[in-house]
């Protein structure tokens, strides 16, 4: 009982000293910022350096998927999605083998000064 009385007196004292009730929240209205309207009628999505919308030039034309049984199939992109890239790699999950390309075992640096031996294998079109 003594602890309860001390707690209530402490809360009342703090609320009078700081002139606030202990469990209130206060908010003020947001200011309208000039030039920062979200829905600006003069918006130009192709303005240099800014892309606010989707522009037709953002898309690339790609090949259609092969059909199996008159249906498009997403799995036709790869021979085996969970095959290693090279015979000496460990079995299991690796980079997929691509249908139109052949992976070479070329581990030479790309430019003078690069560290030799560490990079993805080169891809050669067949």
UniProtKB/Swiss-Prot annotation:
Residues 1-19 form the signal peptide. Keywords: Apoplast, Developmental protein, Hormone, Hydroxylation, Secreted, Signal. Residues 20-80, 96-105, 121-126 form a propeptide. The mature small signaling peptide is generated by proteolytic processing of the longer precursor. GO terms for molecular function: hormone activity. GO terms for biological process: cellular response to nitrogen starvation; nitrate import; regulation of leaf morphogenesis; regulation of root development; regulation of shoot system development; response to ammonium ion; response to nitrate starvation; response to osmotic stress. The keyword Iron-sulfur does not apply. InterPro entries: CEP. Induction: Accumulates in shoots in response to nitrate depletion and to osmotic stress (e.g. mannitol), but repressed by ammonium chloride NH(4)Cl and nitrogen starvation. The modification Hydroxyproline is found at residues 84, 87, 109, 112, 116. The keyword Signal applies. Mostly expressed in roots. Present in cotyledons, shoot apical meristem (SAM), leaves, inflorescence stems and flowers. GO terms for cellular component: apoplast. Belongs to the C-terminally encoded plant signaling peptide (CEP) family. Extracellular signaling peptide that represses primary root growth rate. Negatively regulates the number of leaves and flowering, and modulates leaf morphology. Regulates systemic nitrogen (N)-demand signaling. Mediates up-regulation of genes involved in N uptake and assimilation pathways. Interacts with CEP receptors (e.g. CEPR1 and CEPR2). PANTHER family: PRECURSOR OF CEP10-RELATED (PTHR33348:SF21), PRECURSOR OF CEP5 (PTHR33348). This is Precursor of CEP2. It comes from Arabidopsis thaliana (Mouse-ear cress). The gene is CEP2.
